[in-house]
Amino acid sequence: MSGAPPSYSFVALPPRAKDGLVVFGKNSARPRDEVQEVVYFPAVDHEAESKVECTYISIDQVPRTHAIVISRPAWLWGAEMGANEHGVCIANEAINAREPAAETEALLGMDLVRLGLERGTTAKEALDIIVSLLDEHGQGGNYYEDAHSCHSFQSAYLLVDRDEAWVLETVGKYWAAERITEGVRCICNHLSLTTKMDEEHPELRTYAQSQGWWTGEDEFNFAQVFSPADDHLDCCAGKDSLEKQEESITVQTMINILRDKASGVCIDSESFLTTASIVSVLPQNRSSPCIHYFTGTPDPSRSIFKPFIFVDDVKLVPKAQSPCFGDDDPAKKEPRFQEKPDRRHELYKAHEWARAVIESDQEQGRTLRKTMLELEKQGLEAMEEILSSPEPPDPAEVGDLFYDCVDTEMKFFK
C-alpha cells in the first residue's frame, strides 16, 4: 500500500450545478478494514493558552472553534472530509510527489482538514489557516493504522463554500492554490495545478530552482515540477465522470458519480475500499440551509446517504461513532499501533450484515437494496422541500435529522 489510494473529491458550481446550488462530494478510499465514523462537535470557547491534541502532536488552540460534522477514520483526530456551521466543506487527498513526504510525526493532512473547518468561516479563510499551520508545524506521520510500516503522503485539499471553491496542493511546507468560481472540478491523488495559480508559497519557485526541478526560464507548471517522474498527470477518472454530465448537476447526480465502480471512482480493490462518502449542497441563497449527506459506512453503492443540517441543538448519534479507548488507545501510545482494537460502531456492524446479504445477490439482497434506495429517496425529497421552501426549517425538527435516519436505517437491517 505504498501508493496513494485512488480517492476523488468533486465540486460543481453554477451554471453547471442546478438552481444556484454548489454541490460538493467525496469518496474516501482507505484500507479495506478501516472504520470511519461520523461525529458532530459543537462550537466551543476555549481557555487562553490552551492546547489541542491532534493525531500525533499538540498545537496552540484558538479562542473559539466552530461547530463541525466530520467523517473520519476512527483511530485519528482529524477528518477525511466534513463541513462546518458556516457552510464550509473540506476534503483531503493523499498525494505522491517528487519530494517524499516526511515520516516524522507532525500534522496529518486530515488534521488540517479538521483545523480548517474548526477555524475558518469561508473556504479562503480555511485555506489561509491551513497553509499557516503547515508553515508552523509541517506535515508528516503515518496515514494508516499500521505498526509494520509508515505510509506518509503529501496532501491536496478541495475547500468549498456557498460562493467559490479553492484547490490547495501541498508538498512539504510549499503549496499552490487555484480559485474556482464556476463549472466543475475534480481532484484525486495526483497534483493537478499547472500554470494557473492564484496564490502560492512565497518561496515555491525559488525552492524548485534550488532542487534543480525548474530552470526559471520555462513557464512554471506546478504539477510538472513537483510530480514524480513516473506520475501520469492526467488520469483522474473522476474528472471524466463529472465533465460528461450533460444536465445540471444535482445531489442525485453527485451520489450516482460516487457510486460508479466501472469508472473507478468507487474503489473496491484487494487493498482499498471506499470506506465512507459525503455529498453536500450549499445554496448560494443564504436564507436556505446547507445540507450534508453522509454514509458513515463503506461502499456508497451499498450505503444510504443520510442528511445532516446544522442547528443550535444537534442530537448526537452514538450509533455512528466508534468506541472510545481514551489514553489506552494503541494509536496514542508509543510505539504506536501495537494492537488493533475493534473500532466498529453499531451502524457499521449492522451494515456488514446488509452488505453480505446484498453481495449474495439473492432475492433478499435485491429487496434490501431496493428498500435502502427508497429510504434514501424519501430523505432526498424531504430535503428538496426544505431547500425550495421560503421559510427556514424548524430547528426542533432537523436537530435530530441524522439521528433519525441512522435509527431508521438500522431497523431495516434487523
From Swiss-Prot:
Per the record, what is one GO cellular component?
A: nucleus
Q: Name one GO biological process term.
A: exocytosis
Principal cellular location given in the protein's record = cytoplasm
InterPro entries hit by this protein: Peptidase_C69 (IPR005322)
Question: Is Hydrolase set as a keyword in this record?
Answer: no
- Keywords of this entry: Cytoplasm, Exocytosis
| Record-level Gene Ontology MF annotations | cysteine-type exopeptidase activity; dipeptidase activity
Subcellular location per UniProt equals:
Cytoplasm
- Annotated coiled-coil positions are none
- Mention any additional remark: 'Secern' is an archaic English term meaning 'secrete'.
The UniProt similarity line reads: Belongs to the peptidase C69 family. Secernin subfamily.
What does the record give as the function of this protein? Regulates exocytosis in mast cells. Increases both the extent of secretion and the sensitivity of mast cells to stimulation with calcium.
Name of this chain's protein: Secernin-1
**Gene behind this protein:** Scrn1
